[in-house]
Amino acid sequence: MTHLALPRFWAHYRSLPEDVQRLADRNYALLRANSFHPSLHFKKIEGRRGLWSVRVGAHHRARATEKPEGIVWFWIGTHAEYDRLLT
């Protein structure tokens, strides 16, 4: 599975604390090696066609959309922000 990131994803990423950035980097490496590793909770967002999410530690999430070229990451932030985006 191919994973790509939009420039706006990187803008969100750079706004995160460094420890969360390091965790996101480790989780991305795991995602590339095994997309469905249980610790990632990589899954389609129910009721949101073509949207995916992945866990970045206990307090952060990332969102992506499914495109013909692969999974395109466009957002990363806190779990609270993630919940607000889904409502």
Language-model segments: which ranges?
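A short, surface-exposed loop/turn module that caps and links secondary-structure elements
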Residues: 29-54
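Arg/Lys-rich, positively charged N-terminal/basic patches that mediate binding to nucleic acids
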Residues: 1-27
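Short, charge- and proline-biased low-complexity linear segments
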Residues: 22-31, 80, 84-85
